[in-house]
Regions:
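Perimembrane helix-loop-helix junctions
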Residues: 214-247, 251-256, 266-270
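Hydrophobic/aromatic-rich transmembrane helices and adjacent perimembrane loops
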Residues: 140-142, 369-370, 377-400
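Membrane-interface alpha helices of multi-pass inner-membrane proteins
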Residues: 192-209, 216
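Membrane-lumen/periplasm interface segments of multi-pass, membrane-embedded glycan/lipid transferases
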Residues: 30-80, 250-337, 384
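Transmembrane-helix motifs of polytopic, lipid-linked glycan transferases
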Residues: 88-112, 150-154, 337-346
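Transmembrane-helix signature of polytopic, membrane-embedded enzymes
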Residues: 101-129, 145-146, 361, 365
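Membrane-embedded, lumen/periplasm-facing catalytic core of multi-pass transferases
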Residues: 412-499
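Transmembrane alpha-helix segments characteristic
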Residues: 119-120, 337-374
Length: 499
C-alpha cells in the first residue's frame, strides 16, 4: 500500500466518524426556526437572496438565506424531509472539510502519513473545531467559511506553468520536439477557471458570514509565500470585490458594525453580560476591542481563553479546577504550538525561514485576520478557520520531526522517543474523543429545545398562525431518541469540559 492511499483511508475514517455524529444532531430551535419559516415564504432563491440583504442592520449574510432556500426546496421535493436534507448537508460539509485538509496537506511518504494521523487529532481535538461543526443556523456558515479558505489555498497550490505552455510531442519528420497546437488555449482556460473559482469562493464566503472576508487573506498570503496558482489579476479582482463589499455594506445598505454590548463576551476570568459591557467599556471601547483581538489570537495556539474568558484560571480560583481537562488541553496545546514554532523557525532547502512558506505564512495571516474580525466579541467559532490552518502547520512540523528522528536517532534513544510520541498522541486522541461526547451532548440539547422552548413551557419561536414548518420540524426532532449524556457515568463533562 502506498503512503498516500493509507493517508486517504485514515481521512475517510475521520470523516465518517465526524459526519455520523453531526448527522445525529436535530435541527435546532434557536437561530434556525425563524429563518426557516421566513425563507420558506419567499417565492424563489433570488427572492431569498434579496431578503438576506435586508435581514439585519449589522449582518450581511444573504447567502445563508440563499442556501437555506435551496435546501428547503430539496426537502419539499423529498416529501418534507427537512432533517434528512439539512443534517445531510451539514454532515457532507464536515466530510468535505476533512477531505480538503488532507488534499492541502499532500501526504506522500510514510512520515507524512504518520504526521497526518497526528494532525487530524489536533484538528478534531481543538475547541474551535467543536463549535464549527456543532452549530447550524440553520446551515453551518463557520464550517462553510473554513471550506472556502481551504479551497482557495488548494487553488493557489496549483501549477500555472503547465497551463501556459503548450505540451511538446516528438515529430519524426522534423527530428525534434514540436509544440502541439491547440492545447495551449485549453490550459489557459484551466488557469482562468482557477481564478474565477477563487474569486467566486471569496464572494460567496463574504456574503455568507462577515468572517468570510478572511478568505482574501488566504489568497494574498499564499501568493506572497510563492504560490502562483491564483494569478495576480485574480488578486486584483478579489481586492475589487472587497471594496465592492464595503461599498454595498456601508454606502448601499447603510449597515453598521457591532458596537460594545451587543453580545456578551469574556473579559479576564468573567463572562460579561451586555449590560456589564456597556457600563464598563461604553466610554472606552478600544480597551475591549484590543483585549478581544488578543484573546482571540491566543485561543488557537493555547486553547485559552475560551470566548475571551480564562476559564482555567477562573476554575482554579473557584476551587473547581478539573485537572485532567484543563491540564490535558493546555499541555497538549503547548506541545503542538512548540512544534509549530520550532518548525517555522527552521530553514528549508532554499535557505529561508519556514515561517515564510505557504502554509505557515497563510496560517499566521488567517490567525491575525480572524482575530481582527472578532474585535467586538470573542467567539471560538470565529477562529475556526485559523484552527484548521494551525493543524496544517502542526502536520508539517511533525512530518519534519519524524524525518529527522528516523535519520538521526540512535538505537538507545528510539524507545524513549517512541514512548514520548505515544504519550503526546494519546493525549490528543483523548481530546479528539471529547469531540464525539460534545456532539452527542449537542444532539441531546438540540432535541430538548423542542420541548423546553415550545408550549406549554415557552412561547413558540414563530406564532402558530405563521408557522408552516415548525410542527413538522418538531416531530422529526422528537421522533428519534438521543442518549442523555448528563446521566452517563463517569461524569464525562469533567473529562472533556463544558466549553
Amino acid at each position: 500500500m502506498k503512503p498516500s492511499h493509507a493517508a486517504w483511508i485514515l481521512t475517510a475514517l475521520f470523516a465518517v466518524a465526524v459526519s455520523a455524529s453531526v448527522y445525529r444532531i436535530p435541527i435546532q430551535v434557536s437561530d434556525s426556526v425563524e429563518i426557516l419559516e421566513a425563507v420558506d415564504k419567499t417565492p424563489s432563491i433570488a427572492a431569498a437572496f434579496t431578503q438576506g440583504l435586508y435581514a439585519s442592520r449589522t449582518m450581511l449574510r444573504p447567502m445563508r438565506q440563499t442556501v437555506t432556500k435551496g435546501l428547503l426546496d430539496a426537502a419539499h421535493a423529498l416529501g418534507d424531509r427537512y432533517n434528512l436534507v439539512f443534517r445531510g448537508f451539514h454532515a457532507a460539509t464536515a466530510a468535505v472539510l476533512i477531505g480538503l485538509f488532507t488534499l492541502v496537506a499532500r501526504p506522500r511518504s510514510w512520515a507524512d502519513a504518520a504526521a497526518l494521523a497526528f494532525a487530524l487529532l489536533v484538528l478534531t481535538g481543538l475547541h474551535t473545531f467543536t463549535g464549527m461543526v456543532r452549530e447550524a443556523y440553520p446551515i453551518n456558515h463557520f464550517l462553510l467559511v473554513a471550506i472556502y479558505c481551504l479551497m482557495v489555498f488548494a487553488l493557489a497550490q496549483a501549477r500555472p506553468s503547465t497551463w501556459l505552455r503548450a505540451p511538446r510531442r516528438f515529430d519524426a519528420t522534423q527530428g525534434r520536439p514540436q509544440r502541439v497546437e491547440g492545447r495551449a488555449k485549453s490550459r489557459g482556460a484551466a488557469g482562468l477557471a482557477v481564478d474565477v473559482a477563487a474569486c467566486a469562493c471569496f464572494a460567496i464566503a463574504s456574503l455568507t458570514l462577515e468572517s468570510g472576508l478572511v478568505v482574501a487573506t488566504v489568497a494574498f498570503a499564499a501568493y506572497a509565500a510563492g504560490l502562483r496558482g491564483i494569478s495576480r489579476g485574480a488578486l486584483v479582482a478579489i481586492a475589487a470585490l472587497t471594496v465592492g463589499y464595503v461599498i454595498l455594506r456601508v454606502g448601499g445598505l447603510h449597515m453598521i458594525g457591532n458596537a460594545v454590548g451587543e453580545r456578551q463576551t469574556g473579559f479576564g476570568t468573567a463572562m460579561l453580560s451586555t449590560t456589564d459591557l456597556r457600563v464598563g467599556f461604553g466610554g472606552r471601547p478600544w480597551v475591549l476591542y484590543a483585549y478581544t483581538i488578543l484573546s482571540s489570537a491566543l485561543t488557537v495556539p493555547l486553547s485559552q481563553p475560551i470566548a475571551g474568558q480564562w476559564t482555567a484560571v477562573g476554575a482554579l480560583k473557584a476551587g473547581d479546577f478539573q485537572q485532567l481537562f484543563y491540564l490535558n488541553d493546555i499541555c497538549t496545546s503547548l506541545v503542538a504550538t512548540a512544534l509549530a514554532v520550532w518548525y517555522m523557525s527552521t530553514r528549508g532547502a532554499n535557505g529561508r525561514r519556514r515561517w515564510r512558506d505557504p502554509i505557515p505564512l497563510t496560517s499566521l495571516a488567517v490567525l491575525a485576520g480572524s482575530a481582527a474580525l472578532s474585535y467586538a466579541y470573542a467567539k471560538s467559532e470565529i477562529m475556526s478557520a485559523a484552527g484548521v490552518f494551525y493543524a496544517l502547520v502542526v502536520f508539517l512540523a511533525v512530518a519534519e520531526l519524524a524525518r529527522r528522528l528516523a535519520a538521526g536517532t540512535s538505537e538507545s534513544l528510539r524507545l524513549p522517543v517512541l514512548v514520548i510520541v505515544l504519550c503526546i498522541s494519546s493525549a490528543w486522541a483523548f481530546r479528539a474523543v471529547g469531540l464525539e461526547y460534545r456532539l452527542q451532548r449537542g444532539a441531546f440539547d438540540a432535541r430538548s429545545e423542542w420541548v423546553l422552548r415550545m408550549p406549554p413551557y415557552h412561547d413558540p419561536p414563530v406564532p402558530e398562525t405563521d408557522a408552516r414548518l415548525t410542527l413538522r420540524l418538531r416531530d422529526e426532532a422528537l421522533y428519534r431518541g438521543r442518549t442523555n449524556p448528563y446521566l452517563l457515568w463517569p461524569r464525562f463533562g469533567r473529562l472533556w469540559g463544558e466549553n
